[in-house]
Amino acid sequence: MRTTFATVALAFLSTVGALPYAPNHRHHRRDDDGVLTVYETILETVYVTAVPGANSSSSYTSYSTGLASVTESSDDGASTALPTTSTESVVVTTSAPAASSSATSYPATFVSTPLYTMDNVTAPVWSNTSVPVSTPETSATSSSEFFTSYPATSSESSSSYPASSTEVASSYSASSTEVTSSYPASSEVATSTSSYVAPVSSSVASSSEISAGSATSYVPTSSSSIALSSVVASASVSAANKGVSTPAVSSAAASSSAVVSSVVSSATSVAASSTISSATSSSASASPTSSSVSGKRGLAWIPGTDLGYSDNFVNKGINWYYNWGSYSSGLSSSFEYVLNQHDANSLSSASSVFTGGATVIGFNEPDLSAAGNPIDAATAASYYLQYLTPLRESGAIGYLGSPAISNVGEDWLSEFMSACSDCKIDFIACHWYGIDFSNLQDYINSLANYGLPIWLTEFACTNWDDSNLPSLDEVKTLMTSALGFLDGHGSVERYSWFAPATELGAGVGNNNALISSSGGLSEVGEIYIS
């Protein structure tokens, strides 16, 4: 009988600082029996214990852990503190509990397989297929396949984890010497120059700079830990949230979100000697200018994506990128890196992160509860006035974007802009997903009424119906029409298609992928650089 995995136990290490983000409304993970699990929180290390012999209708339980405590959160909503020690991260498996029960089975031995680690530079993404069973005798794969680099805090030593497949297949000891990687001894700033042309409608600083770079080193935002506690829940996403209903794991702590679409297949190292590149300019304007193709196109770079994919876009007129975070993913210096204040969780550290005339995109889809970080418009405006606007006025931020709304967020944006008339907003950030080109036209034309440049930082051709997604020809047709429209629209300053990856999840569909399965440009990718 075919073995499936419906029981998944997650042990989460406490995470430090602001984490990067990948879009979070496409988190389907399926096997032939249906949805196994969906989760939204980016975490530094994920451990999965798969229990064979169950099907996807069985209960499953998630666990989160720091170094001193473990919380069990089962499918019926119960939460129970589990015993542990200061040197262990406990991973337990669970059987399907009796009705209205969170009974948990604690086998004498079990396999804890860390699938990957991540850091503020490179976040992992998940596979759309079942997690393979691993045993102490045959671990799922070598560490180099599943691991990206993990930044050590200043108190941790600089050794790599895991040391061997034996460690991968055994329960994990959370001593600081095991889960570390290359950490830069110092963070030097190398500068390069770029040019800018002020948009007529933008606020112009007398001397402003824009942050960009090809960072390959990690810089921690703070030393404080965020305790994460996730619970498996069933989330019904409304039509306003793109009409998808999926089970979801919601986080009770401040965190970011992640696309869970493909297994990280190669390690991305953080070199100890690498430096953050921060491109600056002393031009009289804060508005960026690009070259080639339209001069507007960029990359919505999903953290954890193979860096080699970016080579397909070098010297092809794609000259900027962002990654939903505040630290570069390490792409070529030919791409300007644009920062994102993804949510409100790390605002207190904004003054140390946004410096030197940085370009900053605002909160990510705060109008959507499904985005994992909903903020009402009035509160968002107050955050801008308290944390971001002073940085814009001082020149630390040289070009400040509005929150990036979804294409059902125009009312939210209207309320925000009314409450934030003194916020020094330089450009409107937005997302759009759909299949009707005329709807995209109407959306952009409506946003143009604010009289500010527009950045369309996510868009793709999808109806969110994974049983009847648009065909490749339909995607190509919409992209071709959209590129011509956006290139010719006087208010559109920048845009980025979702996404330069091979796997985009069931919601968006892989026909939108700019990268083919072989790692080169897909047919859609070829159109994007033409």
From Swiss-Prot:
Record-level GO BP terms: fungal-type cell wall polysaccharide metabolic process
Region (Disordered), start-end ranges: 69-90
InterPro entries in UniProt: ASL1, Asl1_glyco_hydro_catalytic, Glycoside_hydrolase_SF
MF-aspect GO terms: hydrolase activity, hydrolyzing O-glycosyl compounds
Keywords of this entry: Cell wall, Endoplasmic reticulum, Glycoprotein, Golgi apparatus, Secreted, Signal
Pfam family, one: Glyco_hydro_cc
N-terminal signal peptide: 1-18
A Gene Ontology term for the protein's cellular component: Golgi apparatus
Glycosylation-annotated residues: 55, 120, 128
Localization (cell): Endoplasmic reticulum; Golgi apparatus; Secreted, Cell wall
Name of the protein: Alkali-sensitive linkage protein 1
Organism of provenance: Schizosaccharomyces pombe (strain 972 / ATCC 24843) (Fission yeast)
Highest classification ranks of the organism: Eukaryota, Fungi, Dikarya, Ascomycota, Taphrinomycotina
Designated gene of the protein: asl1
